[in-house]
Amino acid sequence: MFNTHCKSVQEYSQRSANNMADTVLMVVLSIQQNWLSVGEQMTDVRTNKLDSKFLWGNKIKTYEYLMSNKHKMFAQIKAVLNSGRTYDEKAFSLMTIFLRVDGLGLPKAGFCCQLIAGMVGCMDVHNIKLYDIDPKMLKLNPKPKTSKAIEANNSRTKTYID
């Protein structure tokens, strides 16, 4: 399934800034939602934009960020993917791009990396239980102000990638 569907999603996502934003939006809409409802949510957001009943709380901020920054994000993502960097360097750079999106933490940034680039993955509540991972290890300081806090976030991101 991964080799078939994820490759198709990657090709779609890497075709344009709008497609990439669609993929990130799908990831965001899946937060605290039944996966089977995400298609309906996508249709509603595409039709109603900010007036969609599925955009609430942080999802509004995320949508606004995506609409304002999708071209910049897409250019950055393509630059990373086309670079000669190692897998880990690319994965860290992509995670950094996605973690700038309002509303995305490590698991959903990892899901974006998985769907758009075939890297990292989504360590969601189901996988946390399956792999017996401490949920605290998936939390980042949302506004790190010191070099120590920034390094702690970077360290957690690198650990997440591994």
Language-model segment annotations:
Residues 16-20, 30-34, 103, 119-122:
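Short, contiguous, pocket-lining structural segments
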Residues 22-34, 63-68, 114, 162:
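Short, hydrophobic/amphipathic alpha-helical patches that form generic packing surfaces
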Residues 33-102:
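Alpha-helical ds-nucleic-acid-binding substructure associated with the helix-hairpin-helix region
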Residues 2-11, 15-17, 82-86, 92:
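Catalytic phosphate/metal-binding cores of nucleic-acid and nucleotide-processing enzymes, i.e., regions
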